[in-house]
Amino acid sequence: MNKSESRYFNTAVRFNKALLSLLEKKPFEYITISEICEKAEVNRSTFYLHYENTSDLLKETTTYVLDNFTSYFSVDAESIIAQFAN
């Protein structure tokens, strides 16, 4: 991953974390792009470079959460399989 890709990825993660934090406080329907940008400490114009709207961010954030969640199982599954193989 080059420097530009890394920066893009890090910004996306900041948006994901900002949305998750805001979702702890209120329903998705009431979260604004301005609030997300403020929480992520990123300009609004940067938001629109990444997403068309808040629904796009929600889709990506859902994938981000699920990928992190399932990563715990893949490690455990491999160790379980290794135990049965012995």
Each PLM stretch: what is its role?
Residues 44:
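Short functional hotspots where side chains directly engage DNA or cofactors
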Residues 1-8:
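N-terminal intrinsically disordered/low-complexity leader segments
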Residues 9-20, 29-30, 41, 50-74, ...:
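An amphipathic alpha-helix adjacent to DNA-recognition modules
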Residues 34:
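Residues within the helices of the helix-turn-helix
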Residues 23:
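Hydrophobic pocket-lining residues that define ligand/cofactor binding sites across diverse proteins
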Residues 37:
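The alpha-helix within a helix-turn-helix
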